[in-house]
Amino acid sequence: MEGGAYGAGKAGGAFDPYTLVRQPHTILRVVSWLFSIVVFGSIVNEGYLNSASEGEEFCIYNRNPNACSYGVAVGVLAFLTCLLYLALDVYFPQISSVKDRKKAVLSDIGVSAFWAFLWFVGFCYLANQWQVSKPKDNPLNEGTDAARAAIAFSFFSIFTWAGQAVLAFQRYQIGADSALFSQDYMDPSQDSSMPYAPYVEPTGPDPAGMGGTYQQPANTFDTEPQGYQSQGY
């Protein structure tokens, strides 16, 4: 297959980790992976407080367990998704089929855009619940830094995932253009629909000394009728 299809070279080449880590979409995946760890790690470790009066834990975001559950779920799933697509980035240059590369890039566009939307919803949801939280529920301000960190990195994750979607779309455009060129281009020498070129008699010196004319071999059988020849006895 042609080199450069959908942002990668020819299949079967040696794995180059240096080239991999320099790719913008790979860098954004690693950053998104780290952001997801911060979000779900902050909520799991310090997002639940102990109630002295009730004797049970409650979510730091306005005592709304759905807010904490959403943040943890999105963070964990985004963490796994980043690992999946990082593995795809490693394997992508080995994909020899242009159609398979196209499917991988299209899935990258859809998944990245979907996660950007989920992080936007998560940011708005956590920020709203944090804003309406009652100070009396947490008089000692326990876990407030972790709660703010989860909100902040949810906001940052919107742009890292949106950036991945944009980069994947650019790779799709490059791949679509190269695939269109490879399908439309045809070597004229391989085109069977073109008429044969007329024969042109060479005008240069004749290396065989034939004088540029066709000569019948001496031993060729003569098919023309011959007259009767008398034979002497």
Swiss-Prot record:
The modification N-acetylmethionine is found at residue 1. Residues 20-173 form the MARVEL domain. Its main location: membrane. Keywords: Acetylation, Cytoplasmic vesicle, Membrane, Synapse, Transmembrane, Transmembrane helix. It is a multi-pass membrane protein. Changing residue 222 to G: In a patient affected by schizophrenia. PROSITE patterns: MARVEL. It comes from the Eukaryota. The chain crosses the membrane at residues 24-44, 72-92, 104-124, 149-169. Residues 213-233 have a biased composition (Polar residues). GO terms for biological process: cellular response to leukemia inhibitory factor; protein targeting; regulated exocytosis; regulation of long-term neuronal synaptic plasticity; regulation of short-term neuronal synaptic plasticity; synaptic vesicle membrane organization. Residues 45-71, 125-148 are lumenal. Residues 1-23, 93-103, 170-233 are cytoplasmic. It is found in: Cytoplasmic vesicle, Secretory vesicle, Synaptic vesicle membrane; Melanosome. The keyword rRNA-binding does not apply. GO terms for cellular component: azurophil granule membrane; melanosome; membrane; neuromuscular junction; plasma membrane; Schaffer collateral - CA1 synapse; synaptic vesicle membrane. InterPro entries: Marvel (IPR008253), Synaptogyrin (IPR016579). Residues 194-233 are annotated as: Disordered. May play a role in regulated exocytosis. Modulates the localization of synaptophysin/SYP into synaptic-like microvesicles and may therefore play a role in synaptic-like microvesicle formation and/or maturation. Involved in the regulation of short-term and long-term synaptic plasticity. Belongs to the synaptogyrin family. PANTHER family: SYNAPTOGYRIN, SYNAPTOGYRIN-1. This is Synaptogyrin-1.
